[in-house]
From Swiss-Prot:
Its EC number is 6.3.2.4. Pathway: Cell wall biogenesis; peptidoglycan biosynthesis. GO terms for biological process: cell wall organization; peptidoglycan biosynthetic process; regulation of cell shape. InterPro entries: ATP-grasp (IPR011761), ATP_grasp_subdomain_1 (IPR013815), D-Ala_lig_Van_CS (IPR000291), D_ala_D_ala (IPR005905), Dala_Dala_lig_C (IPR011095), Dala_Dala_lig_N (IPR011127), PreATP-grasp_dom_sf (IPR016185). It comes from Clostridium tetani (strain Massachusetts / E88). Keywords: ATP-binding, Cell shape, Cell wall biogenesis/degradation, Cytoplasm, Ligase, Magnesium, Manganese, Metal-binding, Nucleotide-binding, Peptidoglycan synthesis. This is D-alanine--D-alanine ligase B. Gene3D superfamilies: 3.40.50.20, ATP-grasp fold, A domain, ATP-grasp fold, B domain. GO terms for molecular function: ATP binding; D-alanine-D-alanine ligase activity; metal ion binding. Residues 147-352 form the ATP-grasp domain. Mg(2+) 2 binds at residues 319, 321. ATP binds at residues 179-234.
């Protein structure tokens, strides 16, 4: 009987029947990546195996209201689900707090989704959650603290300066002088944002000042990094204690760098899968990705991004994304597809990893 429960089976009239696992798939949210989340979850809902799972979609509006949604999946992608009052039930919170589901699959990009917030909620109510836990999610979300940790372990990174809004407003000239010890061009990044939201590239002091003001809209702490003439390489990592890496991919941005528009609105950006690098370098990058994944305490999944110098081929750590984009054309699932794992099989494995991640 215990074995049957572990395998999610029950017996009906002498036949072994697989009991469906009830999963809450949470989407939307209050971050600037709300629309990205809707795209990702639409793809997941269309490809998840309904023979294995009973799905309970839970949408969070930009205002922070939770609803269970039972209507047309296509209404999620275009945002019309919020107006579909007939299929919008005001019990989104209760589904989790009353443990009406067995597992939570958060498809919430950015703040309140991959920063440890919903992971903490799941831990509090005792529900398994797809992806990394509270600490690793929070750590990887903050670009500055991720850099501090990996710097301690001697991983190569671009030269950088951290700017705090309060200190900047008190000592503007002094801080600009410190930042300008870096060589232009520089990237200016809010510490906690994904999908390149709020990121700008500065070629001079005037653009630096504008970029800092833009970044401070999104976060009080900002990372200013020296730009490297580099190729953008991304690695999909999957697993708990013994993670594996897919073939690396490369991004050829349509613009000067891979900002929000280039990612989601400009169809001229290219994804090269696998990246056009030799096998020895591919293995080196995959090993680096797995080391970083384990050092940061990740589980389930993450995408580890690197910069590879176009002249020296030196590899520099860029960032970790613990809940990467999940449309069928997103890099993370496409890298696994190129490595022999279908989109549906990837979803299955993520759910299994969450269940087994004690």
């Amino acid at each position: 009987m215990l074995l049957a429960q572990q395998l999610n089976l029950y017996i009906l009239k002498g036949e072994i029947i697989m009991k469906k696992i009830k999963i809450a798939i949470v989407f939307g949210g209050q971050s600037t990546e709300h629309e990205v989340s809707r795209n990702s979850v639409t793809s997941i809902l269309k490809n998840i195996n309904r023979d294995k799972y009973e799905i309970c979609p839970i949408g969070i509006t930009k205002e922070g209201k939770w609803f269970q949604y039972t209507g047309d999946i296509n209404n999620i992608k275009n945002g019309q689900w919020e107006k579909d009052n007939k299929n919008k039930l005001e019990n989104g919170y209760n589904v989790l707090f009353n443990k009406e589901v067995e597992l939570v699959f958060p498809v919430l990009h950015g703040l309140y989704g991959e920063d440890g917030t919903i992971q903490g909620l799941c831990k509090l109510v005792g529900l398994p959650c797809v992806g990394p836990g509270v600490l690793s999610s929070a750590l990887c979300m903050d670009k500055i603290y991720t850099k501090y940790v990996l710097e301690n372990f001697k991983f190569k990174q671009a030269n950088y300066v951290v700017v705090n809004k309060f200190e900047y407003e008190k000592n503007k000239e002094e801080i600009i002088k410190e930042v300008e010890k870096l060589q232009y061009d520089v990237f200016i990044k809010p510490a906690n944002s994904g999908s390149s939201v709020g990121i700008t590239k500065a070629h001079n002091k005037e653009e630096l000042l504008k970029g800092l003001e833009e970044a401070f809209i999104h976060d009080k702490n900002v990372l200013v990094e020296e730009a490297i003439n580099a190729r953008e390489i991304e690695v999909a990592v999957l697993g708990n204690d013994d993670p594996k890496a897919a073939v690396p991919g490369e991004i050829i941005p349509a613009k000067e760098f891979y900002d929000y528009e280039a990612k989601y609105q400009n169809e001229n950006s290219e994804l090269l899968i696998p990246a056009n690098i030799d096998n020895i370098k591919q293995e080196e990058i995959k090993e680096l990705a797995i080391k970083i994944y384990k050092l940061l305490g990740c589980s389930g999944l993450a995408r580890v991004d690197f910069l590879m110098d176009k002249e020296s081929n030196e590899v520099y750590f860029n960032e970790v994304n613990t809940l990467p984009g999940f449309t069928k054309i997103s890099m993370y699932p496409k890298l696994w597809e190129a490595s022999g794992k279908s989109y549906s099989a990837l979803i299955d494995e993520l759910i299994e990893l969450a269940i087994n991640n004690k």
